[in-house]
């Protein structure tokens, strides 16, 4: 483990803490915390100001998650490989979590931020390729659930719940692929070290840190959506496209404890 990892954690937290939804709202004359559900995330901003503001906020939130993990992985030499030793993997994933926690507990708004969906997606994409592929799988789940039920919160929760499964699947397929490639080779002196380890049965479980952290992230995101899921059950949660018809989308109300 490289001790320089520690310096990326506070940088990632500060990057994640930039409240783009709040800032965009201020620039357009509203305090997003007093509009609709009180969420500072892209969904509530889109309901209040329109689709283009949703896309702008989502892109910015995703980018602030992407850049810290991408830069940290580049400088620490973990970017672009599945074979990351556990200590370095946990530090890299710590950078990923720091961006999400910065978004959820932004110090600039009294430690009350969003739910971390867009920021988490960007941060996962930056952990290439180990978490990029699970993020893609989660995106597929998000789009399918959204198209069927039209609840952003339900789609986000379903995508988060699928992340540990996708992470396990990606690493199990990686292990199988490397084993098959190694079993067909006889020129061991030209084999990569990880393939020799596979043949000897000595390869570490590289996927375990990623699985553990993906499970933690899934639990965190679902917990942050507990209020939305409760409103879905009683039929009061707005669906996508309800900007004009959903009362919470057009009338100011006090901010709720549940933020996006």
Give, region by region, the residue ranges found by the protein language model.
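Cytosolic, membrane-interface loops and tails of multi-pass inner-membrane proteins
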Residues: 22-54, 113, 230-260
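N-terminal signal-anchor transmembrane alpha helix
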Residues: 1-28
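Multi-pass membrane catalytic core of lipid/isoprenoid biosynthesis enzymes
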Residues: 47-73
């Amino acid at each position: 483990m490289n001790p320089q990892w520690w310096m990326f954690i506070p940088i990632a937290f500060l990057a994640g803490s930039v409240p783009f939804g709040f800032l965009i709202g201020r620039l357009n004359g509203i305090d997003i915390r007093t509009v609709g559900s009180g969420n500072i995330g892209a969904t509530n901003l889109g309901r209040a100001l329109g689709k283009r503001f949703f896309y702008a906020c989502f892109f910015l939130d995703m980018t602030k998650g992407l850049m810290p993990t991408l830069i940290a992985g580049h400088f620490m030499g973990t970017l672009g490989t599945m074979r990351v030793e556990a200590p370095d993997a946990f530090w890299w994933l710590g950078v990923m979590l720091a961006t999400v926690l910065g978004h959820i507990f932004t110090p600039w708004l009294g430690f009350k931020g969003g739910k971390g969906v867009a920021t988490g997606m960007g941060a996962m994409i930056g952990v290439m390729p180990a978490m990029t592929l699970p993020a893609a799988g989660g995106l597929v789940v998000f789009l399918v659930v959204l198209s069927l039920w039209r609840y952003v919160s339900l789609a986000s929760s379903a995508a988060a719940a699928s992340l540990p499964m996708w992470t396990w699947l990606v690493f199990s397929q990686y292990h199988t692929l490397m084993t098959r490639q190694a079993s067909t080779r006889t020129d061991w002196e030209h084999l990569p070290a990880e393939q020799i380890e596979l043949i000897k049965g000595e390869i570490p479980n590289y996927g375990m840190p990623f699985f553990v952290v993906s499970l933690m992230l899934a639990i965190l995101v679902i917990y942050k959506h507990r209020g939305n899921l409760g409103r879905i059950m009683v039929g009061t949660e707005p669906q996508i496209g309800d900007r004009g018809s959903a009362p919470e989308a057009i009338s100011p109300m006090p901010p709720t404890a549940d933020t996006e």
